[in-house]
Amino acid sequence: MLFFVGLGLYDERDISVKGLEIVRCADAVYAEFYTSRLMGTSIERLEQLYGREIRMLSRSEIEGEPEWLEHARDRNVALLVGGDPMISTTHLDLRLRAIEMGIDTRVIHGSNIASAVPGITGLQNYRFGRSATVPFPHIVRGKRIVSSTPYNAVKDNLRRDLHTLLYLDIQDERFMCINEAAALLIEVANGSGDEDFASNLAVGIARAGSEDMCVRAGTLLELKTYSFGPPLHVMVIPGRLHFMEAKALRMLAGAPEELLSGYEL
């Protein structure tokens, strides 16, 4: 059987008791951290707490034809991933391939940023629209390309009074920060003639699940220069606010009263 074990948000202690029991009893334990990272720990600390040797898998060993998957035909194999396993389409694809191979699968869910953000900010979870990722700019034929997809997702959600959760890009050991994401969104907006976009309310969250988590609300322009500290970072662009959401942003994220006054439903 193949067990997908979610490790939670930040460090080795975020695993569930059920997940820990499965890891300790499995015949083999693997991990992949290219889809999501636990920034507050290391593979050595995971091995120490869990009492198991853990083999790290590369992207090709997950998305290609993984030889290790064959072991799950007649043994219990645990795959450790950050957050919740099935948030990533990569893991869903792997699970479906395993089922097609006749391998039984089981998912041990973990806390993830999508479910944590409403609790961190006080924004109601049912009022979030489509999420998006803010990617790093890339170069095509010598031209710098900035994706307009996250900006378009935000605008579409705002038209429907919905909040937008923005994931920030990860490339190897390079982590996008809130400041850069805010700057990229403003750049795309200005290029579209939407110069008022920088005045939108935004919420930055750094190191969710850690003891030194940073949560700050302000205009997008203000977040562009605010120091959030080390990664991982995510950002929320809220739509119109229920009065309880507005109160929560004041108390939990330091949102200025004058900024919130135009956002309440």
Curated annotation (Swiss-Prot):
Keywords: Methyltransferase, S-adenosyl-L-methionine, Transferase. NCBIfam families: dph5 (TIGR00522). Pathway: Protein modification; peptidyl-diphthamide biosynthesis. Its EC number is 2.1.1.98. CDD domains: DHP5_DphB. The keyword RNA-binding does not apply. GO terms for biological process: methylation; protein histidyl modification to diphthamide. This is Diphthine synthase. It comes from the Archaea. It is an enzyme of class 2 (transferase). It catalyses: 2-[(3S)-amino-3-carboxypropyl]-L-histidyl-[translation elongation factor 2] + 3 S-adenosyl-L-methionine = diphthine-[translation elongation factor 2] + 3 S-adenosyl-L-homocysteine + 3 H(+). S-adenosyl-L-methionine-dependent methyltransferase that catalyzes the trimethylation of the amino group of the modified target histidine residue in translation elongation factor 2 (EF-2), to form an intermediate called diphthine. The three successive methylation reactions represent the second step of diphthamide biosynthesis. Belongs to the diphthine synthase family. Homodimer. One of its GO terms (molecular function) is diphthine synthase activity.
